[in-house]
Structures are given as structure tokens and as C-alpha cells.
Amino acid sequence: MDPSSIDLGSIPGGSEQQQHEDGAAAAAGSPKEVFRSQQSLGLITQRFMSLRQRNEVLNLNEVAKELNISKRRVYDVINVLEGLGYVEKVEKNNIRWIGDNNNSEEQNALEARVEMLRQQEKLLELMIRDAQAIIELHFEDPIERPYNYVSKEDIRKTAEPNTKSIIVKSELDTSSSFEIQVTDPSTSGSHDMIVRNKNGVKSHALLFTNDPPEYGDEEDEDDVKKLSSQKRFETSEALRVTLAEMLTDPTTISSSPKHIKLEEPEEIDTEDLETFVLPPSTSASQSNAPYLPETPGRGLFFSPFKSLIDPCILPSFSDDLTSGYINITTPSRATGAGAGASGQEDEEPVSVMDFFSD
């Protein structure tokens, strides 16, 4: 058939004029187009969901009347919702909502768990900040600085046996970042490791095996451990009287002097007395608790926390050791009415032991 012989006007909607008229009618919002848009499945579902908020059990006949749609379209919506697990049929022409309640309970449980995890995260962040502050204070304390090191034995305890460790040491008080490069062993037949300091700070590297040291017997091992402990802390026997014992029995100091052993301390420059403060665990408000120095032979230590107590507050035992109280005095100042009358101040001590003498 010749295409030119086809009459386009005989085809419904085939002519350009007819198509233009249909488009104009649709644009003007003809009743036919409005009715078809109202019968769309998406719009019916939205209207159907608004009815569901009024009553959990719905009658399909009442729904069809209220929405002014055919019952067939209502069943189309119900079949979709039933397939998704939101509704179930309880009686003839009656449905009940089931999906929303289950999802609500599950959602509430998930939200509660998220809130709990959020609180735990905040707690961990606080703990991390506290730990970082403690570490910073630890490195600032000049008494603790000599002990800021890691021994080979500490590394061997955490490393796998029969392996090797590379220790990189930088200069003190430097923040360095390192990069490690490992070459391809296919060319050289071995792994070549290059450790480079990105900041250009001078560093030293040490390679040692993680094999545990061999001892002849258990006694030798115990002797080595004792010797290592003495060498690390470089202290003799410390004070053995604990705070708990003193609180329960205030006469511990006088009745059990064998527990206390004080060695003659080093002489302290009197100009540095203003920089000595009480240990962090002891404050002027806690002066009623018995005080014993934890640092062997010293009892007082240089600390960056000078601003906590001003002027210099030094503890000294009272004459009555059984009372369990501490006198907080400033040795560099005159004490008592007799000193004021004589116009002379007490001589500054040359040893910390002078503060603990009766």
C-alpha cells in the first residue's frame, strides 16, 4: 500500500489538528484528565494512608465510598500493601495495619541503641582527653622525666618471639613523623627497609631480636630481675607504711619504726625552696591526714604545679607523733612569738631531713 494514500483524518487522534485539540483540553484541565489523575495508584495510596491514621482496622467498602473510587482500585492498593507486609486481611472486606507498629518498635529500639552508643562515645572522648592530659603532665614533671623510657624487656613482652624489632629514637622534645619504604624482594632477593624522618630530625635506629634472655636456673632469673629493678629506679628500700595503715592506726609511726627507713637526702639549694610543693595527692585541705613521703629519702619533689600552692607550703611532723596530724608551715619565715621578739628568722635548712626532725 502506498503510504501517501492513507487518510490521517480517519485515524482517531492521528491528525495534527486532533492532537493539538487533545493537548489543549488536557492543559485546560478537562474533567476526563482530572478523573484519570485522581484514579492513579500513587494518589489513591496517599489518600488511603490518610484514612489509616483514623482507625487501625478499615472496611474496604467504606474506604471506596469515602475516596469516591471503585472497589477494584482499592483492592489494587491493598494487594500492594499486603505484599509489602503493611496490612493483613482479618475479615471479609476488612484489613488491619501490622507493618507500621513493628517498624515503630524496631525503630525505637535502634534509636535507643544509637543514643546509648553516642553516650559511650562521649565518655570515651572524655577518657581520651583525660589520658592525654595525664601523659602531658607526666612528661612535664622533671621528677618523672628520668623514668620516661622503654626497655628491651618491655618490647620483648609485647612482640612475637623469634622476630626482630626496629627501634627508632629521635631527639628529645621533638614531634617527628616517619615513613617506611620496603623494596621489592624480587630484584635483590631480600627486603630492604628504609625508615626516613619527614621532618629532617636526626634519628637513631636499633635492630635487635625479640628472643627472651636465657638463664641458667630460676634463681639466676630472679636475681637478674631484682638487679634490673634496682638499677631502673635507683632507689633503696622505700617507706613501707601505707596510708591505709596510718588511718586505721595513728600510732603506726611511733609503734612500728622498723617500717620506716629514711636515707640521708641530697642537699637542696635554698634558692629552690619556693619551687617545692606538696605531692599531688596531698593538699592543704587534707592536712589532717598523716603525711609520709613516697619518694625515698626526699618527701618533697620539684614539680611544675607551683601555682597550686603559694607560698611554699612544706609539711613537718608535730611533736606528738601519735596524734596523726601534720603541721603546715613555711620554714623560711619566722615562727612563734619568740622569733618575732628576737627579730631573727629561723635559719633556712640545708637538708629536707631538717623538716622531719623532732
Curated annotation (Swiss-Prot):
Instruction: Determine if Lyase is one of this entry's keywords.
Output: no
Protein's cellular compartments = Nucleus
Provide the GO biological process annotations.
Answer: regulation of apoptotic process; regulation of DNA-templated transcription; regulation of transcription by RNA polymerase II
Gene knockout outcome? Reduced level of constitutive germ cell apoptosis on a ced-6 mutant background, in hermaphrodites. Blocks DNA damage-induced germ cell apoptosis, but does not affect associated cell-cycle arrest.
Q: Which InterPro entries match?
A: E2F, E2F-DP_heterodim, E2F_WHTH_DNA-bd_dom, WH-like_DNA-bd_sf, WH_DNA-bd_sf
Chain positions covered by the region annotation Disordered: 1-31, 331-358
* Keyword Cell division attached: no
Q: Which Pfam families match?
A: E2F_TDP
Ranges of the DNA-binding region feature: 36-99
Gene Ontology terms for molecular function: DNA-binding transcription factor activity, RNA polymerase II-specific; RNA polymerase II cis-regulatory region sequence-specific DNA binding
The Gene Ontology CC terms held by the record are: Rb-E2F complex; RNA polymerase II transcription regulator complex
- Function, as annotated: Transcription activator. May activate expression of the pro-apoptotic genes ced-4 and ced-3. Required for constitutive, and for DNA damage-induced, programmed cell death of germ cells.
The family annotation for this protein states: Belongs to the E2F/DP family.
Q: What is this protein called?
A: Transcription factor efl-2
Q: Which organism is it from?
A: Caenorhabditis elegans
**Gene that produces this protein:** efl-2
